[in-house]
Amino acid sequence: MREILHIQGGQCGNQIGSKFWEVICDEHGVDPTGRYKGTAAESDLQLERINVYFNEASGGRYVPRAVLMDLEPGTMDSIRSGPYGQIFRPDNLVFGQSGAGNNWAKGHYTEGAELIDAVLDVVRKEAENCDCLQGFQVCHSLGGGTGSGMGTLLISKVREEYPDRMMLTFSVFPSPKVSDTVVEPYNATLSVHQLVENADECMVLDNEALYDICFRTLKLTTPSFGDLNHLISATMSGVTCCLRFPGQLNSDLRKLAVNLIPLPRLHFFMVGFAPLTSRGSQQYISLTVPELTQQMWDAKNMMCAADPRHGRYLTASAMFRGKMSTKEVDEQMINVQNKNSSYFVEWIPNNVKSSVCDIPPTGLKMASTFVGNSTSIQEMFRRVSEQFTAMFRRKAFLHWYTGEGMDEMEFTEAESNMNDPVAEYQQYQDATADDEEEYDDEAADDHHQYES
């Protein structure tokens, strides 16, 4: 019931995804071979709704509802030889041999388009195995070729075939200071254009913000991608915990969307997770609802490089996990809104939703996941857009894209489409609750003029 189909694409998506499955297996007591290894006492909770993310195969093995795709075999090989490599259904690993070479056009139009049917077949097969499919979650990055180009191609195809199912993406944006590839701004801009149109909810992530959390908060001196991905997977597991474990106040992907998206195009969210503590200082932290709330709303805790203090929250959602009083949760949430009222738009009263799930993540007594729709996310788009314009003005690197059959017009279009959400976020950041009345008055005045 309420299954979620997980799709990961490209190197980044596959690495985040495989970490995520380690976390989910751990929470549900599934070992790397797919067998259930929990105790009888835990089994009620862990197995009751394990089918949100797992299929039960013959012999009691649990198989992830996951589709893995890439245009080169490298990452798949390392997943296969990794700790949880044997848990995936072998047919669900779909990969090409050529690679997309960080080129969005290859992922979207040429190489990716050749492989996409094979991926869609697997997606259909998995979707048919579901009782009542709730939606899809896609992990990908926007800077490369496969995750961005082929990832957005897949999202639009799946959208066509399952228009009424939720489409949730975990999208890793290019970082402001750290760049992996020169053509990131092109790939990201072309992708955002697709995400605005075809995704329902986008959780925006960013390596630099994750590095900062690892340095500052977790006190890791040399954080690896594994550490970053672990942070992401904690958040991913938190977003869906209410579907998988019993809770006092449940939420699901659709409730999340209904409560977070005031206008259809404004669906890019910042995410955070608490408690984040360095390995040595865990025993000194008292886990209380106020402490969690404080850390969760902290700007340093956001996993993308946009500062919520530079904008205002349109809406936000907090998912608490663990044994706690819902009354206390509600009080803390109201408290946050009252103390920082200038950071919330006034034309959406009570714009924070909270949900409570009784089962905490492994090894913690309490935890909370934060998802916020803040107008400051436009900083991310703006930054990418500036880098895009700088290169596009000189037509730098364009021949790689036109050589795959793209047209310059597409770039111009993507650029203006990138500026749409920015303008829209800005417009609603400045809007006040009584704006509407002024407009009505003006409209009425015009009306009188015409009549007279």
From Swiss-Prot:
GO BP term, example: microtubule cytoskeleton organization
Entries under Gene3D superfamilies matching the protein: Helix hairpin bin, Tubulin/FtsZ, C-terminal domain, Tubulin/FtsZ, GTPase domain
Region annotated Disordered, chain positions: 414-452
Keyword match Nucleotide-binding: yes
Entries under CDD domains matching the protein: beta_tubulin (cd02187)
Comp. bias intervals (Acidic residues): 432-444
Protein residues bound to Mg(2+): 72
Cofactor(s) named in the record: Mg(2+)
Gene Ontology CC, one term: cytoplasm
Signal peptide: none
Short name of one Pfam family: Tubulin
Keywords: Cytoplasm, Cytoskeleton, GTP-binding, Magnesium, Metal-binding, Microtubule, Nucleotide-binding
Cell location: Cytoplasm, Cytoskeleton
Binding site for GTP: 11, 72, 141, 145-147, 207, 229
Listed transmembrane segments: none
Any one GO MF annotation of this record: metal ion binding
Main location: cytoplasm
Function: Tubulin is the major constituent of microtubules, a cylinder consisting of laterally associated linear protofilaments composed of alpha- and beta-tubulin heterodimers. Microtubules grow by the addition of GTP-tubulin dimers to the microtubule end, where a stabilizing cap forms. Below the cap, tubulin dimers are in GDP-bound state, owing to GTPase activity of alpha-tubulin.
Subunit structure: Dimer of alpha and beta chains. A typical microtubule is a hollow water-filled tube with an outer diameter of 25 nm and an inner diameter of 15 nM. Alpha-beta heterodimers associate head-to-tail to form protofilaments running lengthwise along the microtubule wall with the beta-tubulin subunit facing the microtubule plus end conferring a structural polarity. Microtubules usually have 13 protofilaments but different protofilament numbers can be found in some organisms and specialized cells.
Family: Belongs to the tubulin family.
Listed name of the protein: Tubulin beta-2 chain
Gene (UniProt): TUBB2
